[in-house]
Amino acid sequence: MWYNNILETIGNTPMVRLNKITKDIPATVLAKIETTNPGNSIKDRMALKMIEDAEKSGKLKPGGTIIEGTSGNTGMGLAIAAVIKGYKCIFTSTDKQSKEKFDALRAFGAEVIVCPTNVDPEDPRSYYSVSSRLEREVPNSWKPNQYDNLSNSQAHYEQTGPEIWEQTEGKITHLVAGVGTGGTISGIARYLKEKNPAIQVLGVDTYGSVFKKYKETGIFDKNEVYPYITEGIGEDFLPKNVDFSLIDHFEKVTDKDAALMTREIARKEGIFAGNSTGSAVAGLLQMKDRFKEGDLVVIVFPDHGSRYMGKMYNEDWLRDRGFLKDEKLTARHIIEKKENQQIVTIDCEKTVLEAINTIKSLNISQIPVTQKGMVIGKITESDILNSLIENPSIKSHPVKEIMTGPFPFVDLNTSIDKISAMINKDNIAVLIEANGQIEIITQYDVINAISA
């Protein structure tokens, strides 16, 4: 079986039981893992739906430009669809969003304009206002307006809700989801409550957002609004996609609890999820008294952790905000968590062909080069390939002729953040001398240690 294009792979995401992190909850808790969508987030669903509906209505014309205010995930969904359908994209976002999100959008050819966070939505500098101005100024442009475009929630009514109902065989008793634009929770809730009105829908909000108080009092209180760090949930206004009548309860979660829980999910469940997932799980645990044995709780995991490597998965970032005590993961921890595999080296007088055979037989991508037991350089797959292209006879030459500078050495107390920063396209590993032996740490080892 194959698909005609990447857009056809959107949806039908897996449901995974949570075990360790929910051990104090008597109910069965299932995570709806939306990171398997092509853009690694749930927003792919509604991005495609908004575009398709705009095409049908004539609002989005061939060769047009899509302009949207987005924190990254909706932009990714729109950008992927735009590539396939032949549109251009201009996105506005806030300066609190992670750099990884902006880099990902630009990778798909989108233009990204970064705006200040701490201004009112009506301020001409806000990312809402800038996107609206661009819509007026750019010819043949269309603004999806994910907050008020009801195609957003309709996507989840048509797709995500039915998937959850079928995957749980109609046994779901509670839905837990973060609330940002409101499309995800409202669309799913509408479908599920049509199937079973007794299903409880629990929204997770953040401090600095207006949702919880508005639900409980009917009052839009601007005093509730203040800057917050959590990404993907909460707002300082009321999007039309938030259907408060379908949400039975809002639970607020602090920035700190959300950030730390994001990391805990990776370490306890092996799921590399984003910041709003941390909020949702922290909210779930705060609400544990609502659940009893026999209940089946579905919690939405909206996006992937790769977009938060510079934030929630960065210990220095957490420590700078007072979220983390000074308990750094170090090179020592990485070595302890590695499989007991002895490092492979090659003497500088060995031939390039011998290096090729070693790399192939051991399925590795790099080898430290030694001379009389001392590390003096390295040889990688790309070094070999580039040399062979220039001179095919190089295979019979000694490795020292094509080796490059050695991988950098670090000590056992070097933090995982510093190691991560040192591993790049030029240095795909670092070396450690421990107990008279040389150890190698790759990006895979770093990820494995973080997730352990």
Where are these regions (language model features)?
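Short hydrophobic beta-strand motif reused across regulatory alpha/beta modules
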Residues: 370, 377-384, 439-446
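The conserved cystathionine-beta-synthase
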Residues: 344-363, 369-371, 388, 408-427, ...
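Residue-level signal for well-ordered, solvent-exposed loop/turn and beta-edge residues enriched
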Residues: 59, 374, 436-437
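PLP-dependent amino-acid enzyme catalytic core
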Residues: 1-333
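A short, polar/charged loop-to-alpha-helix boundary motif
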Residues: 383-400, 446-452
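Bateman (tandem CBS) regulatory domains
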Residues: 246, 328-343, 396-407
